Amino acid sequence: MLEILLFLCVIIQRSHINAEITHVVSHLAETALRQDTNFQLLSQDIIAKKFPILDSSCVRRALSDFLPQCLQYGFETVPSDVRTQAAVKLSICELQASGVDNMPPECVGAVHFGACLRAMERTPQWWTTYSGNYQHLPSTCFENALPYEKEQLLSLFLNITDVYSNFQDDLVVDLEKYRANFEATVEASLRLMKASLMEGTHEIVNQLKDDLNYVNSKLADMGETITEHTDNVRTVFNDISDELNDYDMAGQIAHLKEDTMSLWQKINSDMGTYHDVQMSSLYNINAVFDTFYNRATESVQQVRTSVIESQLETLDLIADFNSLVRKSILPVLADELQPQLQEMSVSISRSLVGLSASYNEHLQAWSNRVNETLSEMESHLNNTMSQVEHMNDSIETLENKVFVLVSLGNALTTYVKWIYTFSRALISGYGIVTLIMSMLVVRYSIKLNSSWIKVLGRSTFILVAVVLGARTGSMLSY
């Protein structure tokens, strides 16, 4: 019963540990979800505040086709149709900005540049506006060079920002997948460990129950056997006392010897069987606990390996991204964009470092708890081994006592033989020679301690006195 209570305590402790680990996993999931930050909205706010140049304007749209060719290849390489379209668009922008109401219908809405140009030819004012814009196209090209370059640099920055934002979104998705995979792996490992523990514990408890029932049955059988043996010895002694007067003791002595030998053989056989059963039970218990410990160690190692690999992959992705950012951003934008990018990078690094530290801390705590529980189970197993060894010592002590009892039976058998021989010698009249021979036989055939020799001597003296008294009485009466 003591061993069963100990294993029930171990099972309760395991259930408590499983509940704590489930709580830790849920806490890690909440922590990972809190790390999700909408960097796309943050980048849009920063761009809207820092770069108002992105606001759309009529002049910028009018020069969208003309400026790239003029700045890259020179004004002379720009085709005439592109120049004409740029001049017409600038004229329309100028008229719209002046608030002119009677603009040519061909230049309103969806503009057809050929029709709009022919409509401007009909009015000197409009044609003057167009001609002035066409003549100032070379200076317009150089005047808008710096804003255009800034716009191109800003466009490059926005592209980099979009790439960074997409990378952040992908990183968040990967972290969420990693969290889900980690949680699923932990739950699967916990289910496997719980199933293995329950199976091993159930087998151990059943085996211990069977062993205890077997021991109890054997002890009960031994008690009944000893009781029967005691009753048999008592019956034999009564039969010996009844048969002394009839001088018929040889058959009873032989029967007693046969019963004693058969009982001794049966006890030896039962003791050997019980010893073999106990040893096999101990070996089975050791095998079950070794298997459980190996499986638990493999599961913990697999979880730890998967966590380390995921962290290394995350660090590699961050390192690759940092290298890409350093090599792609132009030196012109370093002074303007470095504070914002550095702040965002530090925020992400802190979030990832905090998440990694939290994972490592909780995983280490879980591993320590598993190791402590395994140590407690090992100590319980050692206590069980010591109790089984104590039972084995008790069985050996009982075996020695049974051996002493059998030796006493053999001594009593030899003593009865000697009494019988002595009585027959006295009756038949062989006299002192027979008495001396009988004493020599007893001296060299019985090997007991001094207390038993004293008891046998006194019994012999009383028996001789009784016989001599009976003979003397017969002679006096004669």
Swiss-Prot record:
Residues 20-419, 478 are lumenal. The keyword Transmembrane applies. It is found in: Endoplasmic reticulum membrane; Nucleus membrane. Residues 1-19 form the signal peptide. Its main location: endoplasmic reticulum. Disulfide bonds: none annotated. GO terms for biological process: karyogamy involved in conjugation with cellular fusion; nuclear membrane fusion involved in karyogamy. GO terms for cellular component: endoplasmic reticulum membrane; nuclear membrane. It is a multi-pass membrane protein. Glycans are attached at residues 159, 371, 392. Residues 443-454 are cytoplasmic. InterPro entries: Nuclear_fusion_Kar5. Keywords: Endoplasmic reticulum, Glycoprotein, Karyogamy, Membrane, Nucleus, Signal, Transmembrane, Transmembrane helix. The chain crosses the membrane at residues 420-442, 455-477. The keyword Ribonucleoprotein does not apply. Required for nuclear membrane fusion during karyogamy. Belongs to the KAR5 family. This is Nuclear fusion protein KAR5. It comes from Eremothecium gossypii (strain ATCC 10895 / CBS 109.51 / FGSC 9923 / NRRL Y-1056) (Yeast).
